[in-house]
């Protein structure tokens, strides 16, 4: 047994399929199962991906039997020749497959309306002797819960995410809850930050990073930094109490830089603040090409506050629709504070909103000058007693999509700060 794993309650995830190994399909099953295991408080130390190869699959199954109490597999339960999971599991422990007549009837019933049914479909009714069946209400491939040797159980689920999730919720998860009653409750809370880098955040929490319970894990996405606080205790309420003082300390250190907790998004926060104040917003975009509008419209409740916007990508639209004087564009360039200001004031007038945001920039890979490099973005926010110009240089090394995303995050976050300060 591997020395770094406590086999008492450890769970391992194995996702099967060459399409996963080659990167053709995102391995969303592993992510979802890992979150589920954390939620029910079972330790999960290892994930693997293996292609549709029986020898490699066999080796990983045997290795898992020596180091983990439970192996959860997804994929390889279908009717095609490369679906090898069940027969390889049986082979690993020298157990014969037997035909399950109930499963066979279920497969025939589900395939009755199909014009062509292959004999391969019926191999899904061949299961290891003694295995508990996990019914599949949506597909033809049943799952199994099987304990082939002492202290080792295999839970096999389909690779189709919808089928896998349903079978986990209805059968696999309840089985784990019953068979691992002594597990501790694991609770996590995520704090989200904008306007600071991951390195800055880490430098200012060095004294907290060594905490064992709760643990603090920083990780970054484009324009945002997150801190996940995770505590383990006998009960969920005890775990939450362990997190509270750390959360208070972090909010004390970073203040308004923390914009949300858990699954809340920046656009949800902004829309909530606008809605609370009964205020509206309109947008004038150039380099972001409607991405800021998409951030609003992709959020429930946006119709209450977001009236509309214009993508003024061409200078003629800036001039003829938004009312930006052509002389101003010629003098300062489309990517400039004066032009961004006129764009914001123009859209404010057109839609008669309380707030407006304008964005103009150079997202690349062309269009830069000596004084205006790729990554230069001008943002202007207009609102009640607010006329604020923001210039950002996101870096010429960034991809076009990254500059667009960073511009959207920066604009939303600055609007959030204005709204909070006026509350």
UniProtKB/Swiss-Prot annotation:
CDD domains: cinA. Pfam families: CinA, CinA_KH, MoCF_biosynth. It comes from the Bacteria. Belongs to the CinA family. This is CinA-like protein. It comes from Prochlorococcus marinus (strain SARG / CCMP1375 / SS120). The lineage of its organism: Bacteria, Bacillati, Cyanobacteriota, Cyanophyceae, Synechococcales.
